[in-house]
UniProtKB/Swiss-Prot annotation:
The gene is rplV. It comes from the Bacteria. This is Large ribosomal subunit protein uL22. One of its GO terms (molecular function) is structural constituent of ribosome. The keyword Kinase does not apply. One of its GO terms (cellular component) is cytosolic large ribosomal subunit. Keywords: Ribonucleoprotein, Ribosomal protein, RNA-binding, rRNA-binding. InterPro entries: Ribosomal_uL22, Ribosomal_uL22_bac/chlpt-type, Ribosomal_uL22_bac/org-type, Ribosomal_uL22_CS, Ribosomal_uL22_sf. Pfam families: Ribosomal_L22. NCBIfam families: rplV_bact. Disulfide bonds: none annotated.
Length: 113
C-alpha cells in the first residue's frame, strides 16, 4: 500500500529542491526527517512538511505504521513560471523567471526480509 502527498506551485526553483530531494529518496521516514532538519537549504522545511503530510496520510487513510514506512518515490517537477521584468541600462529591460515546483512524495511500507 502506498500513501502520497503533493505540494503544488511552491515558490522554490525545482533545481534547488531536487538537491534536497536526492538526500532522502529511498530512506526510512524517521531518518529522512532527521536529515531534513539538519540540512541548511531553503527547500528543507518545505519538503519536510510534504513528507509529514505523506506520513499522516499513510497513518490516517491506510492505517499503516509510521515506524515501518520508507520513501518509495520522491520527485520534483517544474510548475508554472512567474515572469518579471527588471529595468536595465539605456531603456532596456531583462526578464527574471521566478520558478515554481510541484513536490511529490510517496511512502510505502517496508518490505519484509
Amino acid at each position: 500500500m502506498q500513501a502520497k502527498a503533493v505540494a503544488r506551485t511552491v515558490r522554490i526553483a525545482p533545481r534547488k529542491a531536487r538537491l534536497v530531494m536526492d538526500l532522502i529518496r529511498g530512506k526510512q521516514v524517521g531518518e529522512a526527517v532527521s536529515i531534513l532538519n539538519l540540512t541548511p537549504r531553503a527547500a528543507s522545511p518545505i519538503i519536510e512538511k510534504v513528507l509529514k503530510s505523506a506520513i499522516a496520510n499513510a497513518e490516517h487513510n491506510y492505517e499503516m505504521d509510521a515506524n515501518n514506512l520508507v520513501i518509495s518515490q520522491a520527485f520534483v517537477d517544474e510548475g508554472p513560471t512567474l515572469k518579471r521584468f527588471r529595468p536595465r541600462a539605456m531603456g532596456r529591460a531583462s526578464q527574471i523567471n521566478k520558478r515554481t515546483s510541484h513536490i511529490t512524495i510517496v511512502v510505502s511500507e517496508k518490505k519484509e526480509g
